[in-house]
Amino acid sequence: MLFRSLFPLPIPFPGIKLGLANLVIVLVLYKNGFCQALTVSIVRGLLNAFTFGSLFGFLYSLAGSVLSLIIMNLLKNKTHLHISAFGVSVVGGITHNIGQFAVAAWLVGPSAILPYFPFLYFSGLIAGGLIGAFVLLCRQRIPLFSSTN
């Protein structure tokens, strides 16, 4: 969150972020596996909630993180589909926002936020693509992450 505040983006919709922390999560998922990525994600969410946020912020973060990690892990392990880390990250960005949307729908009702869904979907698509591109660069240029899986 602190790092993200150094790069303010003029995004006109509340709650839409680039999700730079997801770069680390995706790299950990590929390097160390699901359990480690889940641990990092939960610890990040807790630290963020205690430092900058609230219980509701943690619920949004947890729902998005867990759902996206489960789906990304499933796609990563489906080797017969030949989905790259870029594709996995794009789907992760979208499913992260779907998880957060589900929490918001549960809290305020789906009809109140349904018009917001297309913006969340496309922001997840774009953010997931940008993070996916960074993941590919990191896996190519940083020896620690250059494994073939």
Predicted regions mapped to residue ranges:
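Generic transmembrane alpha-helix motif of multi-pass integral membrane proteins
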Residues: L20-F34, I71-K76
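Hydrophobic transmembrane-helix microenvironments that flank and shape a buried ionizable site
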Residues: G19, S41, G45, S61, ...
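Short, motif-level signal for alpha-helix interfacial/capping segments enriched in acidic residues
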Residues: P10-F13, N73-H80
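Hydrophobic transmembrane alpha-helices
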Residues: M1-V28
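Helix-adjacent hinge/juxtasegments
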Residues: C35-N77
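Membrane-embedded alpha-helical hairpins and interfacial helices in multi-pass inner-membrane proteins
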Residues: S54, F58-L59, K78-N149
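Aromatic-anchored segments of alpha-helical transmembrane domains
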Residues: M1-R4, V43-G53, G93-G99
